[in-house]
């Protein structure tokens, strides 16, 4: 993959009942980024989400449910001719402790339905993922209620700190300095 990020999407489910849940930490990331950049996210039905143009890149918060996120990402990417390798998806990651944040280049969906749908709609898995740790409930049967509930206060604080760490590296992501981002996040 080459070039910098031209589209940053933050995954989550729409509606107030999901806004503070673990599954929405990608949306938390995107909303915080928009606030820091003084950008207002405007609803764009043709992109199935809230959108803002921020210098040389787009911000996208899908209005679809998580498992249909690919509609929004693919619609905006195709309209603006953004390649999968120029896309960054911020999402919740069960396999990392709350407070961990890592950048991944390409790969599978790892059981994440939002990523699965994005891969399906883009026809490619060659996009970047900003994986924000939320902990694992311990057993697969508890995953759905776990991700659809708010984190504990300690986990919420750790998740917000991870988001801040990721936000500080947006300039490097936009410039395409992915190795520097990985060094910063993974050390």
From Swiss-Prot:
A GO molecular-function descriptor: tRNA binding
Annotated site (Discriminates between blocked and unblocked aminoacyl-tRNA): 13
Keyword tRNA-binding: yes
Family: Belongs to the PTH family.
Subcellular localization(s) per the UniProt record: Cytoplasm
Function as written in the Swiss-Prot or TrEMBL entry: Hydrolyzes ribosome-free peptidyl-tRNAs (with 1 or more amino acids incorporated), which drop off the ribosome during protein synthesis, or as a result of ribosome stalling.
Subunit structure: Monomer.
Active site: 23 (proton acceptor)
Residues binding tRNA: 18, 65, 67, 113
Keyword Cytoplasm: yes
Chief subcellular location: cytoplasm
GO biological process, one term: rescue of stalled ribosome
Enzyme class (EC, first level): hydrolase
GO CC annotation terms, alphabetical: cytoplasm
Reaction(s) this enzyme catalyzes, per UniProt: an N-acyl-L-alpha-aminoacyl-tRNA + H2O = an N-acyl-L-amino acid + a tRNA + H(+)
Highest taxon of source: Bacteria
Protein keywords: Cytoplasm, Hydrolase, RNA-binding, tRNA-binding
Site (Stabilizes the basic form of H active site to accept a proton): 92
Protein name, UniProt field: Peptidyl-tRNA hydrolase
Enzyme Commission numbers on file: 3.1.1.29
